[in-house]
Amino acid sequence: VESPQIRVEQKGSYVWDPPIKDLARDLDKVRYRELSVDRPGTEALIQRADEVFGDLLPPRIQGSFWWTMGLTWEAAKLIGLEQLMMYMYDDPEGLHRVMEWVSGEHMHFIKWFETEGLLTRKDGAQSVGSGGLGCTDELPQPDWHEGGPARLIDIWGFAESQETTGISPAMFEEFIVPYQVPLMEEFGLNCYGCCEPLHQRLDPVLRYIPRLRRISGSPWVDQEIMKRKIGHDFIFSRKPNPTQICTMFNENQIRADVRQTLEIAGDGPLEI
């Protein structure tokens, strides 16, 4: 299903023209993605790379880390961001149907990768989540076979819900988390959060997300609340404000920002 973007000239902002305008009429028309893999093309690419630099750096097939099991990005593309918010009031049962469908579609997506043997390990120096490395001795599972494809339970999972930053923690707990949890159950370890200020909705994340290890601390998070709630039990994945180097460079301000994080969370698992 295509979700055309309607763009304006100012700052590159845009909105979607959602394909689903009427839930009762349109939702039953959408279907899961049809997935395929080009194995001959992949093998040809590997052979070409091996011919060029294989004596220096043997090429290998490595799957990328997908974005994201958060669901609300795709839900917003289907029904529109405003409607995603408004249906929580105007048509809660309809929104539950939307979220159930999107969750099921994502389950279809990840299970296909597993069935086709396309998953690869992410427990080394690979990027996982919204920032951080996958280094861990908890993955893969003890029954993983050396040299074989990874399973979902052998790799990191990741979810977030940046699009719903403006809703209440209660609505987040009702409409979002229950549809993320079945997906997160499939993975060996999990990361949660990206640029949303998670301190406002951290309780249901800690309560329901299984095997959680890494929690995002965005530039807009209250670090003291975050640290108090996660203690030493999870990695505090801190994202300093990028505008400090993108639009200006004030070394004192940058140092002060990092110093504040170290003072608040430096005594526990922390990555910046």
Where are these regions (language model features)?
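A gly/proline- and charged-residue-enriched helix-loop-helix capping module
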Residues: 7-50
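Active-site loop segments of alpha/beta catalytic cores
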Residues: 33-272
